[in-house]
Amino acid sequence: MNQPLSYVHPDAKIAKTVVIEPFSTIDKNVVIGEGTWVGSNVTILEGTRIGKNCSIFPGAVISGVPQDLKFNGEDTTAEIGDNTVIRECVTINRGTSDRNKTVIGKNCLIMAYSHIAHDCLLGDYCIFSNNSTLAGHVTIGDHVTLAGMVAVHQFCNIGRHSFIAGGSLVRKDIPPYVNCLLYTSPSPRD
């Protein structure tokens, strides 16, 4: 059900049970699955693929142009799995020619003000607390939790079932099943 005060591009493929609140924008080349709710003031840009039963809260921007100087307008995507919740003011960039997509798995919770950069791959059942930030090309396994204000350096990998404590800076790979209570990986000068 589209509100008259939202804009939906005529080429967007929106399932019949999708609810789009006022003042949201849905661009061309977008697919949104059954039962998904799009809050007010959400911007869903070209190349977005959203699964079934997702919730996108106000102020979120999905599939923004990658913040990568090598990006040259390639046809890339940002994909969000079924039952995922994207909270207020989250930004998710689409991929570059490196991976061609940014992927958020199924049953994830991405809390307010988090940023997921281009070419990131997130597994299923991930939880990102407020202000968690991934630089480009990061890979996150299933069931990973990032507490508030975690920053992950580009090209890092975080193994499945890991937990990263709030305020941590991750500059190196984290193996699976690791509980990082406060992690700031050593500086190259240390």
Give each language-model segment a name.
Residues N2-C180:
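Structural signal for interior beta-strand "rungs" in well-ordered beta-sheet cores
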Residues Y183-D190:
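Conserved small/polar residues in nucleotide/adenosyl-binding loops
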